[in-house]
C-alpha cells in the first residue's frame, strides 16, 4: 500500500505548493495584456505576437537573477521587492537592444515552501512586470530540500520582447561624436553584492551611516533596481538613440563598450557622474580603490545612451527627468573607456 505521506516525509509539501499557486493568482492577474492566451497553470505560457502590431517582429530575450542580493533579502526578512530586481535585470537588458518587453517567466527554488514568503516574492515580480509592461505568463516554484536550507531560496527570470527589425539597437549606429547621456540608478541595483556583503558584514542593517542621508543601511542595500523600459521606449520608437548600455556587473568598464564597435571608445567626465551616497560609503568603508569602483558598480548611472548631438535636446524633453551629459564617443587609441 502506498504511503500517502512519503513525499511529505522527504521534505516536499505538495499542499503548500498548491497554496502558493492560489496566493499568486491575483498578482499575476495585474500583469495581463492583450497578447496573453490561456490561463495560469498550463504546461506552457502563450502569447499572441500578432497583437503587438509590429510589422517586422524580431524577438529578443534575456535571462538573469539577482545574485547574492538575495542573501540580504533573507537576512533582513524582506522579500517584497527582490522580484522587481529580477524583472529589472532581464528587461533592462532587452531594452538595451531595442525590445519592448512582452512577457516574463520566473523560477523560484527553495528549501521549504513558505506560501506567505513566496507570495511576497512573486508580488515583487508582478510589480516589476507592471512597471515594464510585461505579462507574467508562467513560472516554476521548486521545493528542493537538501539542495537549499529551509530559509533559503533562489530566484531567476526570463524576459521576451519584440522590436521592429529596423529599430534594433546593436551598436552599429554609434559613431564618433555621439553624446553619452546617463540615466540615474536607484542605487546599487543587483550587482556587486558579494563585495557589498563583505564590506558591511559586521553591520546589522539598522545603522544610519552619515553618508546615507538619514536612511537605514538595509533600506539602501535593498532598494529595488530601477526599470527603464517606460522611459526609454519612446526614444526607441522615434529612433533617437544609437546605442544603449545597461550598467550591470563590471560597471562602466565592461558594459559601456558593449554598445559600440571595437574602433571606438567612451570618454567620460567623472565630474558629471551623479555618484550616489551608497557608493561613497562603499568606497570609504570597504577601502576600495576609486578607479576600481567604476569596474564594479553603476556609480549612480544605471543606463547609458549614445545619442547624436542634434537629438540630445529632444531626448531630454521626452525623458522629463534629470539626464546627465557625461561624455562622448571618440576614436579608440588604447582603452575602450576613458574616465577623466
Swiss-Prot record:
Pathway: Purine metabolism; IMP biosynthesis via de novo pathway; 5-amino-1-(5-phospho-D-ribosyl)imidazole from N(2)-formyl-N(1)-(5-phospho-D-ribosyl)glycinamide: step 2/2. GO terms for biological process: 'de novo' IMP biosynthetic process; adenine biosynthetic process. SUPFAM superfamilies: PurM C-terminal domain-like, PurM N-terminal domain-like. Disulfide bonds: none annotated. It catalyses: 2-formamido-N(1)-(5-O-phospho-beta-D-ribosyl)acetamidine + ATP = 5-amino-1-(5-phospho-beta-D-ribosyl)imidazole + ADP + phosphate + H(+). It comes from Streptococcus pneumoniae (strain P1031). This is Phosphoribosylformylglycinamidine cyclo-ligase. Belongs to the AIR synthase family. Its main location: cytoplasm. It is found in: Cytoplasm.
Amino acid at each position: 500500500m502506498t504511503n500517502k505521506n512519503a513525499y511529505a516525509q522527504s521534505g516536499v509539501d505538495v499542499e503548500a505548493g498548491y497554496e502558493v499557486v492560489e496566493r499568486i493568482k491575483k498578482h499575476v492577474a495585474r500583469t495581463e495584456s492583450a497578447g496573453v492566451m490561456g490561463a495560469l497553470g498550463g504546461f506552457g505560457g502563450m502569447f499572441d505576437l500578432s497583437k503587438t502590431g509590429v510589422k517586422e517582429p524580431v524577438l529578443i530575450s534575456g535571462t538573469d537573477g539577482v545574485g547574492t542580493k538575495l542573501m540580504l533579502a533573507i537576512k533582513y526578512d524582506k522579500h517584497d521587492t527582490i522580484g522587481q530586481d529580477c524583472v529589472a535585470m532581464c528587461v533592462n537588458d532587452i531594452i538595451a537592444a531595442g525590445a519592448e518587453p512582452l512577457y516574463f517567466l520566473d523560477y523560484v527554488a527553495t528549501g521549504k515552501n513558505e506560501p506567505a514568503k513566496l507570495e511576497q516574492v512573486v508580488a515583487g515580480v508582478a510589480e516589476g512586470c507592471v512597471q515594464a509592461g510585461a505579462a507574467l505568463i508562467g513560472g516554476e516554484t521548486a521545493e528542493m530540500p537538501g539542495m537549499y536550507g529551509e530559509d533559503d531560496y533562489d530566484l531567476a527570470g526570463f524576459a521576451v520582447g519584440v522590436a521592429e527589425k529596423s529599430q534594433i539597437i546593436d551598436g552599429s549606429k554609434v559613431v564618433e561624436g555621439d553624446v553619452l547621456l546617463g540615466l540615474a540608478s536607484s542605487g546599487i541595483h543587483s550587482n556587486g553584492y558579494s563585495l557589498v556583503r563583505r564590506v558591511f558584514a559586521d553591520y546589522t542593517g539598522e545603522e544610519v551611516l552619515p553618508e546615507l542621508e538619514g536612511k537605514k543601511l538595509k533600506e539602501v542595500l535593498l532598494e529595488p533596481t530601477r526599470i527603464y523600459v517606460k522611459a526609454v521606449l519612446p526614444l526607441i520608437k522615434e529612433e533617437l538613440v544609437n546605442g544603449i548600455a545597461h550598467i550591470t556587473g563590471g560597471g562602466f568598464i565592461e558594459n559601456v563598450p558593449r554598445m559600440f564597435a571595437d574602433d571606438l571608445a567612451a570618454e567620460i567626465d567623472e565630474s558629471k557622474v551623479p555618484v550616489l551616497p551608497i557608493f561613497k560609503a562603499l568606497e570609504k568603508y570597504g577601502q576600495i580603490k576609486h578607479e576600481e569602483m567604476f569596474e564594479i558598480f553603476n556609480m549612480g548611472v544605471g543606463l547609458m545612451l549614445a545619442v547624436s548631438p542634434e537629438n540630445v535636446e529632444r531626448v531630454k524633453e521626452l525623458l522629463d527627468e534629470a539626464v546627465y551629459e557625461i561624455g562622448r564617443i571618440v576614436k579608440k587609441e588604447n582603452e575602450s573607456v576613458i574616465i577623466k
